[in-house]
A protein has these predicted regions:
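Residue-identity detector for glutamine
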Residues: 45, 53, 85, 99-101, ...
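Non-membrane alpha-helical secondary structure
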Residues: 23-26, 30-33, 56, 69-79, ...
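Immediate post-signal-peptide N-terminus of mature secreted/exported proteins
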Residues: 2-72, 173-177, 181-183, 187-190, ...
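Long, compositionally biased
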Residues: 131-209
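A near-ubiquitous, low-amplitude feature marking generic local secondary-structure context
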Residues: 13-17, 21-24, 83, 87, ...
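Mature extracellular/secreted ectodomains of secretory-pathway proteins
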Residues: 72-158
Length: 211
């Protein structure tokens, strides 16, 4: 490795998963490929009419979910936990799948596996940026202490207690990431910070929670 004129070894980025699901482990290759789609995603949402259309889907999706038996709070919190799966759903509703595929296809993504890779990358990115106090707070939530407090005191109606429980679970899941995924994301934290900052608080009208 230290010999004169020795060629640097190519970094092992791991296996590139081309048909990712919600349970497929992240690799550095997956994270790098996702990052390479972010400039195209930013260009995709640069048109004002596109933004307006996708924002309008927020209410329509909540209405549709509620009509199909999904609690409106759950519908919104699913968007908070998995924003990229919500974006994929909006793209399908808007009939823009082929247009979006031109962006993510450059990295050999399909729409659904791009969404899964995106959501797992964001969760791992959030998790790797947690401080000690935030980790402690999450552990308190995971152990159910907040649930017990909500049930113990009679300040809330049953509906309000259920809403609080949904929210607590959503907070936990927003930062839920395993060690493998976090290690895949860690080398790209700076690049992710730079690329994601251009979106601000949302992507295509979908809330984006960043560290």
């Amino acid at each position: 490795n230290f010999a004169i004129n020795a060629k640097p070894k190519k970094e092992d980025l791991g296996t590139r998963h081309y048909t990712a699901t919600a349970t497929t482990p992240l690799s550095k290759a997956d994270v790098k490929a996702f990052i390479n789609t972010l400039d195209g995603l930013n260009n995709f949402q640069s048109d004002d009419n596109t933004i307006i259309q996708f924002i309008s889907f927020n209410g329509l999706m909540s209405y549709w979910d509620e009509k199909n038996g999904i609690d409106k709070n759950v519908s919104y919190l699913k968007t908070m936990v998995n924003p990229c799966q919500t974006i994929a759903r909006k793209i399908k509703w808007a009939g823009k799948r082929n247009e979006f595929q031109k962006i993510i296809g450059t990295q050999s993504f399909g729409l659904d596996d791009w969404a899964y890779t995106c959501d797992k990358t964001l969760k791992a990115y959030r998790a790797t940026n947690l401080g000690t106090a935030e980790i402690t707070s999450l552990n308190i939530l995971k152990k159910g202490y907040a649930y017990k407090m909500i049930n113990q005191y009679g300040y809330y109606t049953p509906e309000e207690r259920q809403t609080h429980k949904y929210f607590i679970e959503a907070v936990i899941q927003t930062f839920q990431s395993n060690a493998n995924d976090q290690e895949a994301v860690r080398p790209y934290k700076h690049e992710l910070s730079k690329k994601l900052s251009v979106f601000g608080a949302n992507i295509l009208g979908t809330p984006l929670i960043l560290p």
